Amino acid sequence: MSYFDDVYCGLCKDILENGVQVHNRTGIDTIKIPSAHFHLDVSKEFPILTTKQLFIRQAVTEMLWIYQAQSNDVRWLQERNVHIWDKWEINEDGDWIDENTGNVLKHFDPSFAHTIGTAYGYIVKKYDLMNKLLNSLKNDKEDHRRVISLWQDSELDTAVLPSCVWSSEWDVTDGKLNIWVHQRSCDVPLGLPFNVTQYAVLLMMVAQVTGLKPGTIDWSIKDAHIYVNQVDGIKEQLNRYETKGSLPAPELWLNPDITDFYDFDPTKDVKLNGYEHMGKISFPLAQ
């Protein structure tokens, strides 16, 4: 059975039972706990939920947009039929618009049109973070300074949203690649399932091209929350878990011929084998 479902449903239950309802910038209250942490062993099980369906192609494509294409251009995703970031796209006038009121939430230089500003892939490219990581893993296995930080103070004012998953630390122990991921704010129903699966794929890809085996993921969250308009969906998912348990975790296949991280194609080189799930649950997405 899927261990990630155990971890995830336990977290959701903790938030509903012990969380505090608070106001926030979106105008939709959240139920939150201040922090959460969990540990996953990717060498034993690929972490993807079975108590609801997760769309692996979209998840991997978004991850590669950040770390492979190193882009902040929303059109790159749209061309691949991924619309995760549409709500945060800067328009041609340089405005980020409230989808409900039409008001300008933030104004940018028009040169940032069709992007999310200076966040995520923009940071990876500007600071050459991915190449530095790959070079370190190939040439200095005992390097203790392997940190990818998407939180750069000088870039925050020109980002639509500062990176939520903002940091990862990379370790090599006994031939296995391990990461510790830090998340400053977490939409647990929508963001967390995607994010964990994405970083598991990233871990496996990086391990493959650097001659290592995938190891563990430690995940730390500050402000783990469920929006109040997502509670019914989470209760449905918890009911599935409590009445049916979870299903066997699938296996992720990566094309073994790929030796360069930048050659991975999510449509050809990444496959999920044996993925059983209990069906889709739709959650509203707060802007």
Label for each model-derived stretch:
Residues M1-Q287:
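Terminal, non-catalytic protein-protein interaction segments that mediate quaternary/complex assembly
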